[in-house]
């Protein structure tokens, strides 16, 4: 024990390092994945059910393909509305900021 630390202190230091590494990993993983809306989760569940039915032989490949395409079309409609709504809200926020800076 040249460092002057007891083995307990060394263990605590190691645990602190492990905890900080875990936090970094959690933060990194949270940044990598986009937030999912309820509609996104519902789409994932529908697609999972289609795969399950296909693998169990309850539906044909053609039927599964049609269902996936229908789900995708519905998703595209929702996604385009969401993007349009986001763009409109950003424009409103920018104009409000400009008005405040002109007044101030």
UniProtKB/Swiss-Prot annotation:
It catalyses: RNA(n) + a ribonucleoside 5'-triphosphate = RNA(n+1) + diphosphate. Pfam families: RNA_pol_Rpo13 (PF12136). It is an enzyme of class 2 (transferase). It is found in: Cytoplasm. Its EC number is 2.7.7.6. Residues 80-104 have a biased composition (Basic residues). Its main location: cytoplasm. GO terms for molecular function: DNA binding; nucleotidyltransferase activity; RNA polymerase binding. Residues 7-31 have a biased composition (Acidic residues). GO terms for cellular component: cytoplasm; DNA-directed RNA polymerase complex. The keyword Ribonucleoprotein does not apply. Residues 81-104 are annotated as: Required to bind DNA. DNA binds at residue 32. Keywords: Cytoplasm, DNA-binding, DNA-directed RNA polymerase, Nucleotidyltransferase, Transcription, Transferase. InterPro entries: RNA_pol_Rpo13. Residues 1-34, 76-104 are annotated as: Disordered. Belongs to the archaeal Rpo13 RNA polymerase subunit family. Part of the 13-subunit RNA polymerase complex. Rpo1N and Rpo5 form a cleft which docks Rpo13. Forms predominantly dimers in solution, although monomers and trimers can also be seen. Found associated with RNAP but also as a homodimer pool in the cytoplasm in vivo. DNA-dependent RNA polymerase (RNAP) catalyzes the transcription of DNA into RNA using the four ribonucleoside triphosphates as substrates. A molten-globule protein, it binds dsDNA in the RNAP, in vitro binds dsDNA but not ssDNA. Its position in RNAP implies it functions in both transcription initiation and elongation. Forms a helix-turn-helix motif with helix 1 (residues 38-56) nearly parallel to helix 2 (residues 61-82); helix 1 contacts both Rpo5 and Rpo1N. The C-terminal region (residues 81-104) is required for DNA-binding. This is DNA-directed RNA polymerase subunit Rpo13. The gene is rpo13.
């Amino acid at each position: 024990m040249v460092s002057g630390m007891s083995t307990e202190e060394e263990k605590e230091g190691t645990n602190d390092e492990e905890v900080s590494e875990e936090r970094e990993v959690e933060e990194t993983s949270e940044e990598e994945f986009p937030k999912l809306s309820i509609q996104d989760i519902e789409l994932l569940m529908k697609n999972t059910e289609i795969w399950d039915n296909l693998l169990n032989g309850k539906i044909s490949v053609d039927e599964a393909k049609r269902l996936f395409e229908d789900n995708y079309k519905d998703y595209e409609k929702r996604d385009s509305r969401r993007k349009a709504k986001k763009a409109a809200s950003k424009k409103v926020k920018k104009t409000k900021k400009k008005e405040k800076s002109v007044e101030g």
